[in-house]
C-alpha cells in the first residue's frame, strides 16, 4: 500500500507542479478541498463503491485507494516539494534529449527522495495502525489486521490477559519504530525542506 501511494502521489504531484493544462487550478482546488473532508464522510461512498466492485472482505480496498492517489495530503506535500525544485533542471534535461517521464525518473526522483520517504513513512504509519477502515472493509477473522486482532484480545466477557495484549502491542509498534530509525534522516529532511528547496 505504501509503495503504491508514493508512486501514484509522485506522478500526480509531478503533473500539478510541472505542467500547464486546462482546469489545473480547479483540479488543484478540488484536491485541496478533499483535505478538509473527514474520513467519516468519505467512508460511506467508498464502501458502496467497493461493495459494487465486489472487493469487500479483502485487502483490495486499501490497494485501490493507494493506486489512485486517494490520499491528497501526500500529493500536496510532493507538489510543494517539486515546486521548490528549479525548472532549469527540466529544461536542461529536455535539451539533453530526455522525455517527460525520463526527466522525472532520472532528474527529479533523486531530488524528491526526502519527500517520498516522508510520504512513505506517514502512509505506513497510518495504514499499519488503521483500525476504522480495517473494521469497515474486513469481516473475516483470519484476514484481520494487527489493530483488529488486538481489539479481539480485549473481550469484556472474559478475563483480559494483559501480558498478551502488551506483547501484541509491542509487535504492532515495532515495524514503525524500526522503519523510522532506518529512514529518519530522509524523514526529517523531507519535513523540514518541503516547499522551501530551490
Place the predicted regions along the sequence by residue.
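A structural signal for multi-pass alpha-helical bundles of membrane permease subunits
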Residues: 1-198
Amino acid at each position: 500500500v505504501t509503495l503504491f501511494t508514493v508512486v501514484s502521489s509522485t506522478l500526480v504531484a509531478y503533473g500539478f507542479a510541472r505542467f500547464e493544462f486546462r482546469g489545473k487550478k480547479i483540479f488543484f482546488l478540488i484536491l485541496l478541498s478533499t483535505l478538509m473532508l473527514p474520513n467519516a464522510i468519505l467512508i460511506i461512498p467508498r464502501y458502496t463503491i467497493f461493495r459494487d466492485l465486489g472487493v469487500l472482505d479483502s485487502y483490495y480496498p486499501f490497494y485501490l485507494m493507494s493506486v489512485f492517489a486517494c490520499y491528497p495530503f501526500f500529493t500536496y506535500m510532493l507538489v510543494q516539494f517539486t515546486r521548490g525544485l528549479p525548472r532549469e533542471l527540466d529544461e536542461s534535461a529536455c535539451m539533453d534529449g530526455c522525455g517527460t517521464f525520463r526527466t522525472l525518473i532520472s532528474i527529479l526522483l533523486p531530488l524528491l527522495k526526502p519527500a517520498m520517504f516522508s510520504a512513505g513513512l506517514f502512509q505506513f504509519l497510518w495504514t499499519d495502525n488503521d483500525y476504522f477502515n480495517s473494521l469497515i472493509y474486513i469481516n473475516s477473522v483470519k484476514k484481520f489486521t494487527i489493530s483488529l486482532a488486538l481489539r479481539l484480545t480485549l473481550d469484556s466477557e472474559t478475563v483480559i490477559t494483559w501480558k498478551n495484549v502488551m506483547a501484541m502491542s509491542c509487535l504492532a509498534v515495532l515495524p514503525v519504530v524500526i522503519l523510522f530509525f532506518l529512514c529518519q534522516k530522509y524523514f526529517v529532511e523531507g519535513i523540514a525542506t518541503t516547499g522551501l528547496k530551490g
